[in-house]
Amino acid sequence: MFYEVRFHGRGGQGAVMAAQALAVAASHDGSSAIAFPFFGAERRGAPVLAFARFGQERLRVRTQVYEPHFVVVLDESLIETVDVLAGLRPGGTVVVNTMGSPDRLVLSKKAKSATVD
């Protein structure tokens, strides 16, 4: 089994670096891991996606993450403009970078949620 994580951020916020750091940390723990970005020619501040996939089995899948176990949102305002929970697996978790509590998040569907500042 492997885990899939999708990062939502804005250009320059570190979504790509966060995905890469997660993959490196997982590989140091003995897991197979891969991370990659998805963005076009947008400028700094435009929405970007990054993905990480890791697990004990050999990774053969090198596609975008469509059904993540975890979603990390680096800019809370993206929740209003992007369907950040699209494809989130049942029982999945969303982590949002905000000073607010998980109770005040307005999410498009039921999901486990956590906040971190």
Q: Which residue stretches match the model-derived regions?
A:
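Active-site cofactor/cluster-binding pocket
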Residues: 1-117
